[in-house]
A protein has these predicted regions:
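Phosphate-recognition beta-domain surfaces
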Residues: 2-225
Length: 225
């Protein structure tokens, strides 16, 4: 009898342990389900965001991977004439980042809009109404440099030296003599720089320190009026 009683007690304890394990498993399952539910909500939000971004990009006149629709509106207000459309003619992420890549895609093209994103996330660029060509200087009375952080436009002050095309061994193009320069292999080195010279005061302050920067991505659009 005593043995039987002990066995019954052991079985009851085992049963209690099993119940506790089952309860713990159920709690874990509930936690997993809750986490899955949260993940599903996050995925849904991300999908909606992507949809909105795609819609925004489709609505943009400037089909850029760098700027959003609000930033596009700012730039459009600066461009001298009302444009009908734009065409992406050069993108370092697709076409390469050398002088020859730029020359192949942009030689003779005008007017153009340059948009740059640095490795630190700064976004700026420039507008050129004259055609890109070898060397320079290239005269342009309508060119300007712009920044989106802070939001500011810098007009050309020396139109006869507004632009410089591909020249020497390492310069892809320049706005002004040294105001805004993009170098050969621009995404692989920090030989790109902003100094300020032939455009309105303040350009130099866009890049802190010595003015040099790495390009994360550079886009050039041909503008159609």
């Amino acid at each position: 009898m005593l043995e039987l009683k002990n066995k019954i007690e052991l079985l009851e304890k085992d049963n209690i342990n099993l119940k506790q394990k089952n309860e713990n498993l159920e709690k874990k399952i509930i936690n997993i389900e809750n986490k899955n539910s949260e993940l599903e909500k996050r995925i849904e939000l991300l999908e909606k965001k992507n949809e909105n971004n795609e819609k925004q990009t489709n609505n943009q006149l400037i089909k850029s991977k760098i700027i959003n629709i609000q930033e596009e509106k700012i730039i459009l207000n600066w461009i001298p004439n009302r444009l009908k459309s734009t065409e992406l003619i050069y993108d370092t992420s697709i076409d390469g980042d050398t002088i020859n890549d730029f020359k192949r895609k942009c030689e003779g093209q005008f007017p153009t809009l340059v948009i740059v994103k640095t490795n630190l996330g700064l976004i700026f660029g420039g507008y050129a109404s004259s055609a890109w060509k070898d060397k320079g200087p290239i005269e342009d009375f309508n060119s300007f440099i712009f920044s989106l952080q802070p939001v500011k436009k810098y007009n050309v002050t020396s139109p006869k030296s507004a632009l410089f095309g591909y020249r020497y061994n390492d310069i892809m193009f320049q706005f002004g003599c040294c105001d805004f320069r993009i170098s050969d292999n621009c995404t692989k080195n920090n030989n790109n720089y902003i100094f300020g010279d032939h455009y309105e005061t303040g350009v130099r302050d866009l890049i802190k320190g010595d003015g040099h920067f790495w390009v994360q991505r550079l886009e050039i659009f041909k503008i159609n009026y």
